[in-house]
Amino acid sequence: MREVPQVLGIVLAGGEGKRLYPLTADRAKPAVPFGGAYRLVDFVLSNLVNARYLRICVLTQYKSHSLDRHISQNWRLSGLAGEYITPVPAQQRFGPHWYTGSADAIYQSLNLIYDEDPDYLVVFGADHVYRMDPEQMLRFHIGSGAGATVAGIRVPRSDATAFGCIDADDSGRIRRFTEKPLKPPGTPDDPDKTFVSMGNYIFTTKVLVDAIRADADDDHSYHDMGGDILPRLVDGGMAAVYDFSQNEVPGATDWDRAYWRDVGTLDAFYDAHMDLVSLRPVFNLYNKRWPIRGESENLAPAKFVNGGSVQESVVGAGSIISAASVRNSVLSSNVVVDNGAIVEGSVIMPGARVGRGAVIRHAILDKNVVVGPGEMVGVDPERDREHFAISAGGVVVVGKGVWI
């Protein structure tokens, strides 16, 4: 083993995100805008770069143009120092087919691993909102002697049925891993909590390569990291769980320590935005010691004119609020809210315009939506249901580029 372990980051960014439709109608899930200045992929990339993991392959597939462009424009590193973040589309190296699962994505990209020859592989998902120092997880992985380490977060057992659940012993060795079980296991120290997988893994390179190659030869496999690779390694006694609550991110507050959100549904996506807007936010975007990097557009500052009022909200650069009221909302860049309009409890994505006297409540407006003067969204449920998507929790979602 080399004195300084060599690490290659692999970001699994091929997710289709069907449950986020219509936000994923024209883009991959990791490319969905979030938080006024970011895309979902920016959180994992920021965590890796902040930890000085600067060789990163982002495996893409589904409607990846905007994701590829975002990475190319906003995540350029110094190639002279061997540093890179590069999007890698499906290579079709073993036949004329796309990735059949997350494990197959790595299998089709094994040449990247062979070329870099890393000691460890940091394999993280691309569609969660969180801060994490992966270097601490790597130290745990090396110290545990495991071939695979899974980042786990504790959730109430009643909420765990939607996740991959981890049954571990007192030492952290995983005894069983089950996708979405009806009866989730408790943790060794709290029977009312369950460790669920965050979709973040660290592998000793040979262990993962051997497992990936064996999985590729298994005609009965779905070629999924959580559903196939991890159970294979658990059965071999090679997997451990890393307790995310032990991860200490510089600059974290008591309010947002160990914050992690799976934003795979419209309601979860909306709720995670509402976590940003209070005086003491549940997730703090303003941590300068562990920054989240996002869009690098050269935009003018936001402007509030003619008595425009903004309370408990995040407003992106280039936005103009003119004699309008914005409360408990997240507005992305270049949003215009005209005279007399009201925006409450809503998420407005880049380039949207809310016309004079319009009302937007409990809604998500995708990029470049135009709401005409006096129009209402989130006010009349029956009318909204006829024209827009509505989440299980009642959030009205207007797709990209719609004129109302």
Curated annotation (Swiss-Prot):
> Entry's InterPro entries?
ADP-Glc_PPase, ADP_Glu_pyroP_CS, GlgC_bac, GlmU/GlgC-like_hexapep, NTP_transferase_dom, Nucleotide-diphossugar_trans, Trimer_LpxA-like_sf
User: Which pathway or pathways does this protein act in?
Assistant: Capsule biogenesis; capsule polysaccharide biosynthesis; Glycan biosynthesis; glycogen biosynthesis
Tell me yes or no: is Transferase among this UniProt entry's keywords.
Answer: yes
Enumerate the Pfam families for this protein: Hexapep_GlmU, NTP_transferase
Q: In which residues is alpha-D-glucose 1-phosphate bound?
A: Y99, G164, E179, K180, S197
GO biological-process terms attached to the record? capsule polysaccharide biosynthetic process; glycogen biosynthetic process
Catalytic reaction list: alpha-D-glucose 1-phosphate + ATP + H(+) = ADP-alpha-D-glucose + diphosphate
Entry keyword set: ATP-binding, Carbohydrate metabolism, Glycogen biosynthesis, Glycogen metabolism, Nucleotide-binding, Nucleotidyltransferase, Transferase
| MF (Gene Ontology) | ATP binding; glucose-1-phosphate adenylyltransferase activity
Q: Name the top EC class.
A: transferase
PROSITE patterns in UniProt: ADP_GLC_PYROPHOSPH_1 (PS00808), ADP_GLC_PYROPHOSPH_2 (PS00809), ADP_GLC_PYROPHOSPH_3 (PS00810)
Instruction: Give the SUPFAM superfamilies listed for this entry.
Output: Nucleotide-diphospho-sugar transferases, Trimeric LpxA-like enzymes
Reported EC number(s) for this entry are 2.7.7.27
The family line of this record is: Belongs to the bacterial/plant glucose-1-phosphate adenylyltransferase family.
Q: What is the purpose of this protein?
A: Involved in the biosynthesis of ADP-glucose, a building block, required in the biosynthesis of maltose-1-phosphate (M1P) and in the elongation reactions to produce linear alpha-1,4-glucans. Catalyzes the reaction between ATP and alpha-D-glucose 1-phosphate (G1P) to produce pyrophosphate and ADP-Glc.
Q: What is this protein called?
A: Glucose-1-phosphate adenylyltransferase
